[in-house]
Amino acid sequence: MFKDRENKRFIKIFKEGSLTESIQILLDTETGVNYIHLNAGYGISLTPLLDSDGKVVVSSEREIQNYIDRN
């Protein structure tokens, strides 16, 4: 359904885990906000990624373009 879209709003910039448990960092290419996506069994969580000061991690336009170029 969404794989045919040329300009994806969310791109995966990190993934680690196994078949049943995983952690991913997703980047919203429109806002620059980074999200952490946890998947464990039947449970799923999606929340903004926070830095050490508790502020939302926002990628710069340059970082976003670098990630888009890699994918």
Describe the residue ranges of each PLM region.
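Motif-centric detector for short Cys/His coordination patterns
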Residues: 2-23, 29-30, 37-71
